[in-house]
Structure formats: C-alpha cells, structure tokens
C-alpha cells in the first residue's frame, strides 16, 4: 500500500536565477533542502528548521514566500508519495552541507530539467513552475 509523507521544502534562488539543490548521503537524486515536520510544526516552521539543520542558514518567516503545494512520487523511498509544501526565498550565500547532506548544487532550472539525477517532484512540478514564472528567477 502506498504511504504519503508530508514535507516542506525551500526553493532558494540566487541573483543568477539558479536554484540550490541538495543530495542526501547514500542517495542519488538531487532535491530542494527540506524535510518532514516534527510534532505540531506548521509547514513554514518545518522548512525554517530543516534549512537551518541542513545548511546552517536562518530565514525569518517574512523571507519565505509560499510557492505552492504539490503531490508526487518520493525520490528515495519506494511505494511512497509526497505532499510537498514549497516556500521560495532569495539567497546568495555559500552554505555548507550539514546533517545528512552529501552535496550541494547551484543550477539553472533549464539545465536541471535535462539531468537524470533530479527528484521526480522537482522535475515534474517545481522546475516547470519556476520556468513559467521567470520573474521569480530574476530573469
């Protein structure tokens, strides 16, 4: 039986219009920073905590804009779908991969669409939405 995970993730966009993607240790797919809520957390509280744990970056609530809610297959777990709450923010730092992260990648969304190592939800929903709203990319 398919289970559903709820997650919150961040679309961090720099001034060059690139999105920051992360790859967790022991996995092959890049995705946005983020994760599952702890008990009682709202989606925005979850994304703020996860971004701090994974990248050491603190955002205020006012810095993060709700960017949509999508459902799709989980990248690293079989028979699992995810319900993802996304938040977008401008970010130009050079974070270090912390916690369970192995690798960080700043990439143009157009280039990310051509890669095989991008999480399904990102490739099918988030990147096309970003490209359809080019003002979000600073383009």
Residue ranges and their predicted role:
Residues 5, 69-96, 109, 133:
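Active-site-adjacent beta-strand/loop module that shapes the phosphate/pyrophosphate-binding cleft
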Residues 12-13, 21, 89, 106:
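Conserved hydrophobic "DFG−1" position in protein kinase catalytic cores
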Residues 30-34, 107-109:
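A short, polar/proline- and glycine-enriched secondary-structure boundary/capping micro-motif
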Residues 86-88, 96-129:
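NUDIX/MutT-family hydrolases
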